[in-house]
Curated annotation (Swiss-Prot):
UniProt cross-references to Pfam families, sorted A to Z: DUF1190
Region Disordered: start-end pairs: 178-223
Name by which UniProt lists this protein: UPF0441 protein YgiB
Family: Belongs to the UPF0441 family.
Gene this chain is encoded by: ygiB
Superkingdom of origin: Bacteria
Length: 223
């Protein structure tokens, strides 16, 4: 009988531990998962220029100007480059292309190729930029140039896209949205020219990937 009581007590302790510790472990795991999600996202604002940013952030004019100028430099380095003005205009529309500085990320051999064909190479104008909130406990802020097309035939038509072709919705400044922190990371420098329609293809592919990822996430959350 003593042995039976001992076995029952051990079994009771084991079952009690399983019943009571499992929910605690799940709760702790959930907290860490939520914390991980919070750390992986960042709230950003979309502006067309430094004036828009300054109007939305009174007293932060200097920071807005710095972010805008940094975004312009990043655009020169990472924007899609075209050998001819016609190729750029076909992708982005009339009035949205400019000659790119010779040092704007291009490899010397590609600079020479572009200069032989048209005297220069071309890139889209920066249509706007994303900027992290002007808070953060001294951590500073980041910015990311955005591009947009006025050509209805382009997948980038009326949308804000980054240099990789990722779509951030309608090209409407003044919006605030949540993006992965990776969205604000510096993009690779453009080292080759893009063929006509090439950037639009990148936008289309990125949009397909984004829709697929959203669908997978929704199914996972729905069980």
């Amino acid at each position: 009988m003593k042995r039976t009581k001992s076995i029952r007590h051990a079994s009771f302790r084991k079952n009690w531990s399983a019943r009571h510790l499992t929910p605690v472990a799940l709760a702790v795991a959930t907290v860490f998962m939520l914390a991980g999600c919070e750390k992986s996202d960042e709230t950003v604002s979309l502006y067309q220029n430094a004036d828009d940013c300054s109007a939305a952030n009174p007293g932060k004019s200097a920071e807005c100007t710095t972010a805008y100028n940094n975004a312009l430099k990043e655009a020169e380095r990472t924007a899609p480059k075209y050998a001819t003005r016609e190729d750029c205009v076909a992708e982005f529309g009339e009035g949205l292309c400019q000659q790119a500085p010779a040092k704007a990320g291009m490899a010397p051999e590609n600079q020479a190729q572009a200069q032989q064909s048209s005297g220069s190479f071309w890139m889209p104008l920066m249509a706007g930029y994303m900027m992290g909130r002007l808070m953060g406990g001294g951590a500073g802020f980041a910015q990311q140039p955005l591009f947009s097309s006025k050509n209805p035939a382009s997948p980038a038509y009326g949308k804000y896209t980054d240099a990789t072709g990722k779509n951030y919705g309608a090209a409407q400044p003044g919006r605030t949205m949540t993006v992965p922190k990776t969205a604000m990371a510096p993009k690779p420098a453009t080292t080759t020219t893009v063929t006509r329609g090439g950037f639009g293809e990148s936008v289309a592919k990125q949009s397909t990937m984004q829709r697929s990822a959203t669908g997978t996430s929704s199914r996972s959350m729905g069980g």
